[in-house]
UniProtKB/Swiss-Prot annotation:
One of the Pfam families matching this protein, by short name: KH_2
Region (G2): 36-40
Annotated segments matching region G4: 116-119
Region spans: G3: 57-60
Function recorded in the entry: An essential GTPase that binds both GDP and GTP, with rapid nucleotide exchange. Plays a role in 16S rRNA processing and 30S ribosomal subunit biogenesis and possibly also in cell cycle regulation and energy metabolism.
Similarity field: Belongs to the TRAFAC class TrmE-Era-EngA-EngB-Septin-like GTPase superfamily. Era GTPase family.
Domain KH type-2 positions: 186-274
Sequence segments annotated as region (G5): 146-148
Region span, G1: 10-17
Sorted UniProt keywords: Cell inner membrane, Cell membrane, Cytoplasm, GTP-binding, Membrane, Nucleotide-binding, Ribosome biogenesis, RNA-binding, rRNA-binding
GO MF term list: GTP binding; GTPase activity; ribosomal small subunit binding; small ribosomal subunit rRNA binding
PANTHER family, sorted: GTPASE ERA, GTPASE ERA, MITOCHONDRIAL
Record's protein name: GTPase Era
């Protein structure tokens, strides 16, 4: 019996959240083509035979002077030290520079190099990219090109991970797929709906605060606030005749209901808090974990 923690690390938009959902077999983490979509750690748990693998999805590595982004990067770096193993994700379209920066981290556990988005190219380009990483072969334990549209890759990745985990009793009940607080999961489902429903810079200047969750036998009631920094952004989030906020609510309820398997009553409000992203205490205590 093995059990251990595996941190998913890589630059923004490398496909970490998509891979987490693929490996766990459930939609846990928000997925968006917009960069820096992931703001909180989300843990997913997968069983492979008798072995338990706890995945930690983290914000993407990037350079930024903004307080919120710095805290997001700190979350990602800290998760490396907390892990038994790292999956470093690199898009098939990227060069090796991000990986070389990762190798400069002194205290890091063993890692597997995952090449993502291979479905967007051909076998020749995949082989060429594998050749570019071959010079680092003494650094990684394995390198795996992955196409998450094909289920066969799931077993291959989990098998390689299980080989490297320590012998340990289960950290969590093997029947659960996440130990992340439901508030954080529901919050990200709502934020993902915001990302899909509005364009431009609005999602980057907004976040979600879950105020209350009331669970009953057949229904869960959720009260939440979408926080943004200007009245003009608030009007965009509301939309003409309330169309946008209605669309956000419909998408959010479906995602939460699909996950929780119960009927959802969602009360969404929009709250303006100017400069919230520069309020370090607010960001630390409410938005980034």
């Amino acid at each position: 019996m093995k059990s251990g923690f595996v941190s998913l690390i890589g630059r923004t938009n490398a496909g970490k959240s998509s891979l987490l959902n693929f490996l766990v077999g459930e939609r846990l983490a928000m997925v968006s083509h917009k960069i820096n979509a992931t703001r909180r750690k989300i843990n997913g748990i997968a069983m492979f035979g008798e072995d338990q693998i706890i995945f930690i999805d983290t914000p993407g590595l990037h350079k930024s002077e903004k307080i919120m982004n710095k805290l997001m990067i700190d979350v990602a770096i800290k998760s490396i030290g907390d892990a038994d193993l790292v999956l470093f994700l690199a898009s098939i379209h990227d060069d090796t520079r991000d990986y070389e920066e990762f190798l400069k981290i002194a205290k890091r556990p063993p890692h597997i190099l995952i090449l993502t988005k291979t479905d967007e190219t051909d076998d020749g380009k995949i082989a060429k990219k594998l050749g570019e990483y071959a010079k680092f072969c003494k650094e990684f334990c394995a390198i795996i090109p992955v196409n998450i549209k094909k289920k066969v890759y799931r077993a291959e990745i989990l098998r390689e991970i299980a080989k490297l985990l320590p012998e340990h009793e289960y950290f969590f009940d093997p029947q659960i797929i996440s130990n992340t607080n439901l508030r954080d999961i529901y919050r990200d489902f709502i934020l993902e709906s915001v990302y899909e429903s509005v364009s431009s810079e609005i999602p980057y200047n907004s976040d979600v605060l879950i105020e209350k969750i009331t669970e009953k036998e057949q229904i869960t009631k959720i009260s939440a606030k979408i926080i943004t920094d200007t009245n003009s952004h608030k009007q965009i989030l509301i939309g003409k005749g309330g169309e946008t906020i209605k669309r956000i609510g419909i998408k959010s309820r479906k995602r939460i209901s699909d996950f929780s398997k119960v009927k959802i009553h969602l009360n969404l409000q929009i709250f303006v808090k100017k400069g919230w992203k520069n309020d370090e205490n607010l960001v630390k205590s409410v938005f980034v974990y």
